[in-house]
Amino acid sequence: MLMPRKVKHRKQHHPSRTGMAKGGTSVAFGDYGIQALEPAYVTNRQIESARIAMTRHIRRGGKIWINIYPDRPLTKKPAETRMGSGKGSPEWWVANVKPGRVMFEMSYPNEETAREALRRAMHKLPMKCRIVTREEQF
């Protein structure tokens, strides 16, 4: 799973999910990409699940780039715990994704197969997305 090796602070404030993405809004490495249309927290498990869905569909050939990284810890308090007594322990790692961000990129010779692989990966993500190419941008 993706997660930082070492962090300065174990617990962080929740990042803002409002506004549009400032960078990473165009396809830079591959020919096709998945672009977010809504803000969301994407967990390390969701990123890994989308990556596996893409690689299993394209088999050999092609290349995949992951442009987001889960560097934010989200905390959770145990079940049946009274209010107060501090913040909960870190439970999972998330990437803060804003609308317009290209999260995954892919280069593959056959466009139809590449679009199907990206469509399968989009089903694993917690927000609305769309497939973009190098020519068309947000």
From Swiss-Prot:
**UniProt feature coiled coil, ranges:** none
Q: Which GO terms describe its cellular component?
A: cytosolic large ribosomal subunit
Q: Name one Pfam family in it.
A: Ribosomal_L16
Q: Where is this region: Disordered?
A: 1-24
Keyword hit for Ribonucleoprotein: yes
Answer whether the UniProt record assigns the keyword Protein biosynthesis to this protein: no
GO molecular function list: rRNA binding; structural constituent of ribosome; tRNA binding
> InterPro entries this protein is in?
Ribosomal_uL16 (IPR047873), Ribosomal_uL16_bact-type (IPR000114), Ribosomal_uL16_CS (IPR020798), Ribosomal_uL16_dom (IPR016180), Ribosomal_uL16_sf (IPR036920)
A Gene Ontology biological process term: translation
- Composition bias of kind Basic residues appears in 1-16
Could you list this entry's UniProt keywords, alphabetically sorted. Ribonucleoprotein, Ribosomal protein, RNA-binding, rRNA-binding, tRNA-binding
- SUPFAM superfamilies reported in the protein's UniProt record: Ribosomal protein L16p/L10e (SSF54686)
Q: Between which residues do disulfide bridges form? A: none
Signal peptide stretch: none
Q: Which PANTHER family match?
A: 50S/60S RIBOSOMAL PROTEIN L16 (PTHR12220), LARGE RIBOSOMAL SUBUNIT PROTEIN UL16M (PTHR12220:SF13)
Function recorded in the entry: Binds 23S rRNA and is also seen to make contacts with the A and possibly P site tRNAs.
Tell me the protein family, please.
Answer: Belongs to the universal ribosomal protein uL16 family.
**Entry-linked NCBIfam families:** rplP_bact
Quaternary structure and partners: Part of the 50S ribosomal subunit.
Q: Protein name, please?
A: Large ribosomal subunit protein uL16
Organism lineage reads as: Bacteria, Bacillati, Actinomycetota, Actinomycetes, Mycobacteriales
